[in-house]
Amino acid sequence: MKQDCPVIEVFPMPPLPWPRAAWCLLHLGVLTSLPALAAPDQVVRPYVGYAVAHDDNVLGAGDGVDRPGEVVSSTSRRAEAGVLVDKRIGQQALSAALRFTRTSYEQLPELNNDGKDLRLNWNWHVGNHLDGNLGATYVQALAPFVNFHGRERNLRSERREFADGGWLLHPSWRLRTGVSRDTLTYDLDAQQAGNRVEKMGELGLDYLAPSGSTIGTQLRHTRGDYPNRQQLGALSLDNSYDQDELKAKVSWLITGKTQLQFLGGLVQRKHDAFAARDYRGLNARVNANWQASAKLGVALAGWREIGALDDVTASYTLNQGASLGATWDLSDKLRIDGQLKHETSDYSGTAVVASVLPERKDTVRRATLGLVYKPTAHLRLGAQAYRNERRSTLAGNSYPTTGLLLNSRYEF
């Protein structure tokens, strides 16, 4: 697809090698921000942003590992340009979000990368009883260093296509269904075993109470295909699987200020090869939100669930954890938010190769504190400090990391 910018030259090209599409968005932002074009119900909202971050352990270097002369901390700078689109045509609602970033690391230039975040959605309606969503997303970014600590640039691409719909059978009953396809790929050869395609189908039925609360059940089937076999010594493993779920789904409006959400039930995963890795057990997630006052909000969450991960030694982890967050609006322009999180991950997917890989369990504690300031309706400034502590039974994978992020965003 051709991505040439308009002929009008708004300002000179800066030295950063951004994609052409990002500069098109910048030009569009200046043009649509002119007084003659601006409107309160603006459909297209371009924006630009800039951020500076410092992390004292970018690569997740383990405690007690001797790395003489190796750089583990770095300051990074991220420039971004994007556009948000929201358009309503009758009952139909169309939305799009496009974001392009350029991130540069001062001490680790080999990690410099261009990122993309593209999202499209059509919230469709047919009469008063049928509605749903049809959309797609694409995200390209640097993969996290949780389980991979090398200095090579490891870009991860995630693509998702989805469709869902609901039918209001009765004022008190709603039938819903959905399908999706998720594709994840890595650039780095060492991570190719983690490439996967997951296809999901879901069917649910909800009771809609007059109070606004809902209670229902849902069935979900997921097929996960790993095109590249995992090599562990002399073993060659196929991590493809089928997963079935039967869960209860509850959204309880306890009061006008308190809401409780629950999703939990039986989950069963069967692998195409090596049944010792199969899983069957209860999974659940609960979220509680409390608006304590007009300015203070509190969120509490707890979970026990299996999930995929960025690691080539396990097909899944069993994650159990809890988090506590709060948001405090000091004024119309100033907000403070923070979160405490504790999670334990059991690498159960390595059971088949216990003779090759040791049993592994990780515990992660994370604390964040942020400040957001909006001096004008278009400009947002932010600062965030964080501290992570990872403790692992796997040698060399226990490490702390502390960081600070300063960011800004201007929406035209």
What is the meaning of each model-derived region?
Residues M1-W18:
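N-terminal secretory signal peptides that target proteins for export/translocation
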Residues V7, L31, Y50:
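Alpha-helical and His/Cys-centered functional microenvironments
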Residues A38-F412:
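Gram-negative and organellar
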Residues S33-P35:
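N-terminal signal peptide c-region/cleavage motif recognized by signal peptidases
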Residues P17-H27:
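Sec-dependent signal peptide recognition
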